[in-house]
């Protein structure tokens, strides 16, 4: 090999890299899974509570025991995708702060499947987040990291971490990570679809079309949520489209640092970036601190954030490393 040709950088997760290899095939081979359906008549729809690209979500009632539940009616998508979501939910059953799948039913005529979940009395994040204290932010961030560490330890990337998918019952101080429709099994060295996560929460790896990503994608999304919480912003990086999203990130993390990342993994940037990227120095996190957020954006919070929001996915803290950070010491 000639000197100028560097060997391609192999990117493998620093943790839980081989979980699925060590599991029996049926653990991750969702395509060959046989679902068992319950009875649709056991559930009644009360009211609509949300809708997504792939589903409509209702508050429901289990008529057998008169308990509330959530009914997620799936829109027609590839059945393989539905199987993946079910398999992942079953694999994660009972994990800390993971939403519980109670039943799977389907309409006898239309064959439309619905997933029945535990009920969480959620307060919309736009209402809740501005009211959270410093302690609350530490507490709920830690609870979310528990859920993420658990799914990662089971060989699963969530790939859609954002406030809309974190249900919080503030009265009970209960957090649940929901919507596992984009979640996927991690196999080291495998190339994945970069069309995952919501724009404002997409990691740089997705925006530069790097397909060999891993669990650290979820850490980026978590970091973006955390930044918005401590700096009291609605959204921390708010791009107009996927290209502009990377520009918004570069204006904070710097362009030299972006080029170093791209070079390390031998990524070829889309030519569209030539005209829009410009040149930006890395911004100091303290430049986002103001009178309004000073009590939340303290030294420990900023040190943690700095270790989460890194271009290089291999440099980001893992969930366990983040949970061991001094920021969370007060909870222990």
Curated annotation (Swiss-Prot):
Binding residues for ATP: 49-57, 72
Gene Ontology CC: cell tip; chromatin; cytosol; division septum; mitotic spindle pole body; nucleolus; nucleus; protein kinase CK2 complex
Sorted UniProt keywords: ATP-binding, Kinase, Nucleotide-binding, Serine/threonine-protein kinase, Transferase
SMART domains per record: S_TKc
Active site feature: 160
EC number: 2.7.11.1
Sample GO molecular function, one term: protein serine kinase activity
Family, per entry: Belongs to the protein kinase superfamily. Ser/Thr protein kinase family. CK2 subfamily.
Source organism (scientific name): Schizosaccharomyces pombe (strain 972 / ATCC 24843)
Any one GO biological process: positive regulation of establishment or maintenance of bipolar cell polarity regulating cell shape
Residue stretches in coiled coil: none
Keyword Cell inner membrane: no
Gene symbol of the encoding locus: cka1
Reactions catalysed according to its record: L-seryl-[protein] + ATP = O-phospho-L-seryl-[protein] + ADP + H(+); L-threonyl-[protein] + ATP = O-phospho-L-threonyl-[protein] + ADP + H(+)
Domain Protein kinase: 43-327
Function of the molecule: Catalytic subunit of a constitutively active serine/threonine-protein kinase complex that phosphorylates a large number of substrates containing acidic residues C-terminal to the phosphorylated serine or threonine.
PANTHER family reported for this sequence: CASEIN KINASE II SUBUNIT ALPHA
Subunit structure: Tetramer composed of two alpha chains, one beta chain and one beta' chain.
Record's protein name: Casein kinase II subunit alpha
EC class name: transferase
Superkingdom in the source lineage: Eukaryota
